[in-house]
Amino acid sequence: MATPDQDVRNRKINPEARMELKEHLREFRDRLIKAAIATIIAAIIGTVFLYQPFIEMISAPLQQINIETGRRANLNYGSVASPFDQLLKVGMYIGLVIASPVWLYQALRFLLPALHTKEKKYLFGFLTASIFAFACGVAISYFTLPGVVYALLKFTPVNESNYIDAGVYISFILKFVVTFSCAFIIPVILVGINMLGLIRGKTILKSWRWVVVLVAVIAALTAPGSDIMMMFVLMAPLLIFFFAAIGICMINDKRRDRKLAKLAQGSDEASLNTATSSEDLAKMGYFEEEKTS
């Protein structure tokens, strides 16, 4: 019985080779198992070595509010099993992040044999741009998160304490980072849609007001602080990414228009250099005109 790697090698040797549905499903299952094993190993490593630094990092704004304002803000684990539950939850998320290269590698090994060279080039370009955009979103959210938490905690009344449920707080942190980071991928998706010819850059540019409104809503949802400057700090990089994507779309449109113009010009020249057949001349009435003359 052929293994998935043997199937891939066979398809490299013979690009026109076809796999049965059962073989596709077996290869998909094996690659999914490999990615899952990598995630479990990465989750164990993340739980042992990275869980405590992660908790210290997200607790830093709470300690800052304690020192600067006198308001008490602490994480609260509401049950006996809650610390262990949060340990597993955070460890799994860390494992998914660490093992993401393995997931990506297994997905590519499964998909690439079915793609042509040009499609592979587009896929690698899209993945590279998406990873870069997502990483930028993670970095920006990492630096802005303490300010967001600090601004929200300042609403705690004076001489009152804020005992935050650990599960709710960790979920808030994860949603903030993931939502803001995914927002950076939207411009990459716009470029991908433009490359497919489904939308033109000028069409997106005409809707620039809606783009600004969308970015403002995303910034307001991910940074609901009392300081309006925090919202503008988050809006700035998103707007730069969006308008850079629009510029790339317009450049791609001009390149595509030039290619289409050359193809049209070439077809016109070919038609001029081709002699008209006798059948076409007969349809045009050329021979009848000769007889009457």
UniProtKB/Swiss-Prot annotation:
One of its GO terms (molecular function) is proton motive force dependent protein transmembrane transporter activity. Belongs to the TatC family. NCBIfam families: tatC. This is Sec-independent protein translocase protein TatC. GO terms for cellular component: TAT protein transport complex. InterPro entries: TatC. The chain crosses the membrane at residues 35-55, 87-107, 123-143, 173-193, 204-224, 228-248. The Tat system comprises two distinct complexes: a TatABC complex, containing multiple copies of TatA, TatB and TatC subunits, and a separate TatA complex, containing only TatA subunits. Substrates initially bind to the TatABC complex, which probably triggers association of the separate TatA complex to form the active translocon. It is found in: Cell membrane. The keyword Transport applies. Part of the twin-arginine translocation (Tat) system that transports large folded proteins containing a characteristic twin-arginine motif in their signal peptide across membranes. Together with TatB, TatC is part of a receptor directly interacting with Tat signal peptides. HAMAP family: TatC (MF_00902). The gene is tatC. It comes from the Bacteria. Keywords: Cell membrane, Membrane, Protein transport, Translocation, Transmembrane, Transmembrane helix, Transport. GO terms for biological process: intracellular protein transmembrane transport; protein transport by the Tat complex. It is a multi-pass membrane protein. The keyword Transport applies. It comes from Rothia mucilaginosa (strain DY-18). It holds the Pfam family TatC.
